[in-house]
Amino acid sequence: MVLGVTTTERWWPSPFGPDDQHGMLNLVDEAKRLEALRLVREGRMYDLGHELHEDIPVFPGRFFRQTLVTTAHHANADGGVGDNDVNWVTEQVAATMQLGTHLDALSHLQIGDRGYNGCTVSELAGTAGVRRLGVETVPQVVTCGWLVDVSARRPGPGDVIVVEDLGGVDPSPGDAVLFHTGWSARWDDPARTSRASLVPATPWPSSWSSGRWR
């Protein structure tokens, strides 16, 4: 994420057309998916998601609350209900959706009043959600990936990921680049991962040059 940068550059309309809602994911086409599948040798999977719980680090004002509900709660009883003594466990969740491990939709960020494809906030925002660029428009993604490990740098406050950190990475159009920053080691330390102001709350921002690198 690039913060603390202003620009007067007009970035719309998108090269994919003024009505596009997929952004650079347009480059993940059938040929790119087949290229990615040909790279598979062992079939291993890696979970990139963190567990959601009430003490996860969040932006100020955001929250996650989960309440377990069982048949016993409903029936005020110790066992199940009916002739077959059936029981069940469900949960009630109240949360800000923009927390934990997630994928940002193109509607999430704007510079001033303009977001992707020049959409204004008033054009995007409806009373029950966004009118355009919502996460429901994001296509399924199967593509080639590059992992860049910058965790050994142990950055101080205000340090950013710069082009020089990218080393010999040479992605082609449609590839995904993932950064291992080491920040996950602080996941269970809300005092380190939550801040009262926007910029310090965003660990390891990238520089403007690395954001535009490809």
Features from the language model and the residues they span:
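Active-/binding-site microenvironments in catalytic and ligand-binding cores
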Residues: 1-214
